[in-house]
């Protein structure tokens, strides 16, 4: 599993292009909100992440 962390002010292209490419390659990928709610990007695009940081099990 690949986790892409999203924080307020993230650069949309830098986060979402890799997510798109990984998913096209059938690599399990999830976006993670570090604030527990939809995350506003640097260019005004708000992204609803797949999970919140509290939901991620790294063990």
Each language-model region and where it sits:
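Extended, subdomain-level signal for the structured scaffold at the beginning of enzyme domains
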Residues: 1-59
């Amino acid at each position: 599993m690949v986790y892409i962390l999203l924080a307020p002010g993230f650069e949309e292209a830098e986060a979402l292009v890799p997510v798109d490419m990984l998913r096209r390659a059938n690599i399990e990928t999830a976006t993670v909100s570090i604030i527990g709610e939809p995350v506003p990007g640097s260019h005004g695009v708000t992204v609803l992440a797949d999970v919140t940081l509290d939901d991620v099990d790294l063990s």
